[in-house]
UniProtKB/Swiss-Prot annotation:
Its cofactor is Mg(2+). Belongs to the RusA family. It catalyses: Endonucleolytic cleavage at a junction such as a reciprocal single-stranded crossover between two homologous DNA duplexes (Holliday junction). The keyword Zinc-finger does not apply. This is Crossover junction endodeoxyribonuclease rusA. Homodimer. Binds 1 Mg(2+) ion per subunit. Its EC number is 3.1.21.10.
Length: 131
């Protein structure tokens, strides 16, 4: 079974590292800084959710490409080497996909392919394939 889709976003997702930490009454509290809620990412993942979850214990390949909008046309399709870190973006995305039941558990992913590229528009391409 193979499931693939893509969607555009006004703002690209943020990572946990971009969230804030403050000390209140001697205890650390984590909070969402303005713009770190990822509502549009969650909404798009809910909208594109597969009808059936991939079965438990089925090994999966997850391929994701994050396209970041930039104005300089000559830099489109070049690698994005600046922040956010790709591994943090992927962990965030995989957590949402697990919660939304794209697959039973993210331990099913045995093959992970991820890329960050500059492009004309902010968008994400996702492909999940049984291995």
């Amino acid at each position: 079974m193979k499931f693939e889709f893509e969607f555009e976003l006004d703002k690209m997702p943020t990572t946990q590292q971009q969230k804030g930490i403050k000390k209140v009454k001697g205890k650390l509290q984590f909070y969402d800084r303005r713009g770190t809620n990822n509502y549009s990412l969650k909404a798009q993942l809910m909208k594109n959710k597969p009808k059936e979850c991939f079965e438990k214990n089925v090994p999966l390949k997850l391929s994701v490409t994050f396209f970041y909008a930039i104005k300089q046309k000559k830099r489109w399709w070049q690698w994005k080497t600046s922040r956010p870190d790709l591994d943090n973006l992927m962990k965030n995305l995989q957590d949402y996909m697990t919660k939304l039941r794209y697959y039973s558990d993210d331990s099913q992913i045995v093959w992970l392919e991820a890329k960050k590229v500059n492009d004309e528009k902010n968008r994400i391409e996702i492909e999940i394939t049984e291995v």
